[in-house]
């Protein structure tokens, strides 16, 4: 299983992220427990070696 930490504008905002989806100007992230957060911005980097996702908005 691969889960990632999600950073928004350099700040850790979610852990154990399993799903990331881009819809229009929003990025939707869902964690291991089904909790969902929406961010207005762009995915800048996904680093699977470090298990990190970076969004800037």
Curated annotation (Swiss-Prot):
- Give the domain of life: Archaea
Q: Pfam families from the entry?
A: CooT
Q: What is this protein called?
A: Uncharacterized protein MJ1551
Species of provenance: Methanocaldococcus jannaschii (strain ATCC 43067 / DSM 2661 / JAL-1 / JCM 10045 / NBRC 100440) (Methanococcus jannaschii)
